[in-house]
Amino acid sequence: MSSSQAVRSSKYSYRATSTGPGTADVNIEYIQDLSSLSRLEDKIRLLQDDLEVERELRQRIEREKADLSVQVIQMSERLEEAEGGAEHQFEANRKRDAELLKLRKLLEDVHLESEETTLLLKKKHNEIITDFQEQVEILTKNKARAEKDKAKFQTEVYELLSQIESYNKEKIVSEKHISKLEVSISELNVKIEELNRTVIDISSHRSRLSQENIELTKDVQDLKVQLDTVSFSKSQVISQLEDARRRLEDEDRRRSLLESSLHQVEIELDSVRNQLEEESEARIDLERQLVKANADATSWQNKWNSEVAARAEEVEEIRRKYQVRITELEEHIESLIVKVNNLEKMKTRLASEVEVLIIDLEKSNNSCRELTKSVNTLEKHNVELKSRLDETIILYETSQRDLKNKHADLVRTVHELDKVKDNNNQLTRENKKLGDDLHEAKGAINELNRRLHELELELRRLENERDELTAAYKEAEAGRKAEEQRGQRLAADFNQYRHDAERRLAEKDEEIEAIRKQTSIEIEQLNARVIEAETRLKTEVTRIKKKLQIQITELEMSLDVANKTNIDLQKVIKKQSLQLTELQAHYEDVQRQLQATLDQYAVAQRRLAGLNGELEEVRSHLDSANRAKRTVELQYEEAASRINELTTANVSLVSIKSKLEQELSVVASDYEEVSKELRISDERYQKVQVELKHVVEQVHEEQERIVKLETIKKSLEVEVKNLSIRLEEVELNAVAGSKRIISKLEARIRDLELELEEEKRRHAETIKILRKKERTVKEVLVQCEEDQKNLILLQDALDKSTAKINIYRRQLSEQEGVSQQTTTRVRRFQRELEAAEDRADTAESSLNIIRAKHRTFVTTSTVPGSQVYIQETTRTITE
């Protein structure tokens, strides 16, 4: 509880009469601090509070005594009931001994508390005596200070009286000075009236000059307006000239551009003409070729009508192709003709534009000449206006000089008038200041007299209070002696009470130490568990990190290998595709050659059937067919070798596919292991969260306990305040016969304060433990968040690896599709080759049959371009 302090102020006024003209009143304020009385009142209230608390404690002890007596009776009954069991009797005896020991300790605690209360009362009594002595010393010091202040105030009063006399003398001197200044003011007023008359004359003359000046300024403004119009017309003419020049330059540029475009168009026309000529020549060549082809066609038609019937479709296709090509060429020629016509139109249009531009140029040149003439005339007019303006400016400057001189005279007169007015104002201000000073000095003298009177009154009051304090001091000494006697009486009771209180304190200390040991053991166990959990988490996290890093490195290695194999496979596929395209082209050539040979062979058969004279040509065709066959065989061998290469490549692809599938299975197993480890880590994380929740619940329980203690403390404070209010009402009745109870209550309060301090220490320790636990919880949460982040990163890496694996699977499937396509193509080529071989075999068999029927001898010369002589012998077999 906070002690309230009261301040009492006493005022004394002294009135003194001096030999001077005025009286002085002096006021002295003296403040006395009554903190000692307030302290005593607070102590009395505290003692009353302790009395009530001690009464409550006594009632509680009596209740406990009654409860214990009831328990003793119950225990005796139980002992009578359980006489048969020796062990039960021993336990009951032990419990009874323990309860008796507790009661003895309580009695010892009461004795100790009483001794402590007596010591406290002695200390309080000594403190009260010292406080009274200090108050007496303070009062004596205050009295000495008051006497010193009185002497100072008297000296100040004498000084003020001397100042008043000096002020009166200065007042007489200032009144004389004021009369002199009034005479000078009247003279200055006469001068001011004369100056006003001269100012009126000067102002009339100034108005005349201003009117003349206004007229001259109007003339100057008119001339300026004319000049502005002339300059504006000049600027317009110059701008028109510049526009004309710009137009001329633009026209020149356009003309040059048009000439360059014309030149380009002519070049393009020449190139188009050359193209037309080339196209016409190509058309003529094509027509010649067509004529030749038509002639060949007619000759072939005349020769082999039967062949035309057989190959009518091929001829129609060739005709269609030629017709399509002819139509394309005709369309191209028509487009070229259209381009030529467009270019000729452009040329004519550009020529017309050039003519129009030439006409515009001539017009602009004529307008330029006219504008130059008008500019020359304007410049002449401008020179005349400038000469007039110079004359008017000279007149204006002379008039301004005269006006400035007159204005300077007027300013001087006005300045003198202002000085006179300022002097007058200063004199009036000084007069007012002197009057105000006189009034203030009179007021200060009256205030000093009043303060002297107040100081005398305060001195009288202080003397009366001194007498009262001496009487109170005597009464306090008598009360002190009585209280000392009472304190000696209470000392014995207090010693007994203190002895009992010490015993109780020892028991409570033992209980507190046991509780502290238990709490410290629990805290150490919790810390050990937290440390073990942290170490386990850290080891598991490091192990998982290491495993995942190893797996990531393995995955990266496998990815690099897969990328390399993919690149190699892509290169092989590209090579194979190029080889396949080459094979296809070569095979198409072979097919064409085979078709040509077959066509030739069919023609030979028809000729042999129809014409025996064409056997030599058939033989030549046979030779060519043999050659083609050899080439085909060679190509077949090459194709077979390429097919073997493709099969080996396909086998390698299949092996690579199997390897990739194995790697995929390994990656899948790794993925399953990682997912299992992730599940294990999630379970551990959940366990850690459960432990954290348990720790948080414990923290909340501790906080609730602290809140309960604070509420109990607040309720106790409220009860103490209420009791203090009640005790203030019953102060006088409770102080008389309650010293012994007060001593016991003070001892009890000390015990409660000690318990409070111990509770505060426990509270501080629990808060420290809570903070440590909160730190550990935060660290665990941070580690959990880091683990979650690592898990997220690992999941991202796994997703990326799965995506890459899917990409590899797609690439593998695409490669498989490509390999299947290549195998189908190879099989198709093999089938076509087998069909060609069958055809060649049939042709050979038919040729052998023909040879058997007809024998031909071919004689050829080695000279190129020589004729072939065929000697044919027919043999008919008749049976």
Swiss-Prot record:
Can you supply one Gene Ontology CC term for this chain's record? cytoplasm
- Residues modified to Phosphoserine: S18
**Region Nonhelical region, annotated ranges:** 1-31, 859-879
Where expressed (tissues)? Expressed in all larval and adult muscle tissues. Expression is five times higher in tubular than in fibrillar muscles.
- Can you cite a GO biological process for this protein? myofibril assembly
Coiled-coil spans are 32-858
Q: Does the keyword Hydrolase apply?
A: no
Which SUPFAM superfamilies does UniProt cross-reference here?
Answer: Myosin rod fragments
Task: Briefly state the modifications made to the protein after translation.
Answer: The more-acidic and less-abundant isoform is phosphorylated.
Taking the first listed entry, what is the main subcellular location of this protein, grouped into a coarse class?
cytoplasm
Q: Which Pfam families match?
A: Myosin_tail_1
Provide the protein's localization: Cytoplasm, Myofibril
Q: Which InterPro entries match?
A: Myosin_tail, XRCC4-like_C
Q: Can you state the subunit structure given in the record?
A: Heterodimer of two isoforms.
Family as reported in the entry's similarity comment: Belongs to the paramyosin family.
Q: What does this protein do?
A: Paramyosin is a major structural component of many thick filaments isolated from invertebrate muscles.
Query: This protein is called what?
Result: Paramyosin, long form
Query: What organism does the UniProt record list as the source?
Result: Drosophila melanogaster (Fruit fly)
